[in-house]
Amino acid sequence: MAFAPMGPEASFFDALDRHRASLLAMVKRGAGETPAGATRVASSSEVLTAIENIIQDIIKSLARNEVPAFTIDNRSSWENIMFDDSVGLRMIPQCTTRKIRSDSPKSVKKFALILKVLSMIYKLIQSDTYATKRDIYYTDSQLFGNQAAVDSAIDDISCMLKVPRRSLHVLSTSKGLIAGNLRYMEEDGTRVQCTCSATATAVPTNIQGMQHLITDAKFLLIVEKDATFQRLLDDNFCSRMSPCIMVTGKGVPDLNTRLLVKKLWDTFHIPVFTLVDADPYGIEIMCIYKYGSMSMSFEAHNLTIPTIRWLGLLPSDIQRLNIPKDSLIPLTKHDQMKLDSILKRPYITYQPLWKKELEMMADSKMKAEIQALTLLSSDYLSRVYLPNKLRFGGWI
């Protein structure tokens, strides 16, 4: 069944079509390049062998009367991170490591957690079954203590084995939503047709299992906040701008939402834009989609989309549109610290227009939420701001 054309006339998308042509040319130039040290989807036998080797090392340590320990790349230091403009933030090949020792009061529990989770992952892969992070937590909630401890152990194991989480047969529940001109088949054969209606589709739990993706979308819009996403659907923005796809991670995106956006980019190579608040935390979220995060830098190749463009809300838009000053919010001390941190990151050097916008925010000492546009008119965002941005190439 073909998607029903409901959007604007073809000439509306001229700027988008030109942008896509430049993206396709760039993709063609960089085809086949994979960064050294990138995680890859490993076969079940490879992961099982890697786990067996780790356990053998522990047994050998015990046999030599040495203290068993896990050696894990340090994912919490900028010294271990490099910027690659084709991938984003990724770990350097020879990064510093940390030891999780079994005889240290500070790390003995962490050692036990990793050992326990390794055992569970081994059984999952052997039986070709999957479990969610939540399932793993509830198998021994007393040992784990909290969900965050499980999440951290899984990420450490993924980093230690140099494989993405999906190769470990561990899934996470999705909080993200998707709407628009897209249909696909899930791993179990379920056919899903996303729509432009007010009811969005939940991001699948197993992104790797998505098959037969079909779309005629001209662009993909990532919306920072669920409230803005729902407002756009209620205002029929998705229908009026059809064909398009909209995604929200409801704030800081979970892994599945990031994997989905990456899969859509890799499959269709359509322009991807972000709509975030003009504040340091909105910009941080946009940077996670575009360049990745320090903690997940070992898996950047599977998660980042450096071609993402910032559609709004730009600090310069606040001045250009004469948004009332009483709707602006002063930057807090934490905001200013976050802004300073972003300005010092390696990728900002490669984005002079972004840097200019961030400096404008720093100079004004003010921030604005997307909702501030409603002061101009209740549907200004969906009927004026976004359509004009898309039509006239108002992205950076």
Curated annotation (Swiss-Prot):
The keyword RNA-binding does not apply. High levels are found only in the testis where expression is restricted primarily to meiotic germ cells. Not expressed in spermatogonia. Highest levels are found in pachytene spermatocytes. Very low levels are found in thymus, brain and oocytes of embryonic ovary. Not detected in adult ovary. Isoform 1: Expressed early in meiosis, when most double-strand breaks (DSB) are formed. Its EC number is 5.6.2.2. It comes from the Eukaryota. It catalyses: ATP-dependent breakage, passage and rejoining of double-stranded DNA. GO terms for cellular component: chromosome, telomeric region; nucleoplasm. One of its GO terms (molecular function) is metal ion binding. SUPFAM superfamilies: DNA topoisomerase IV, alpha subunit (SSF56726). Signal peptide: none annotated. Mg(2+) binds at E224, D277. The active site is at Y138 (o-(5'-phospho-dna)-tyrosine intermediate). Its main location: nucleus. The keyword rRNA processing does not apply. GO terms for biological process: double-strand break repair involved in meiotic recombination; homologous chromosome pairing at meiosis; male meiosis I; meiotic DNA double-strand break formation; meiotic telomere clustering; oogenesis; ovarian follicle development; protein localization to chromosome. It is found in: Nucleus. Residues 42-177 form the Topo IIA-type catalytic domain. Belongs to the TOP6A family. This is Meiotic recombination protein SPO11. It comes from Mus musculus. The lineage of its organism: Eukaryota, Metazoa, Chordata, Craniata, Vertebrata.
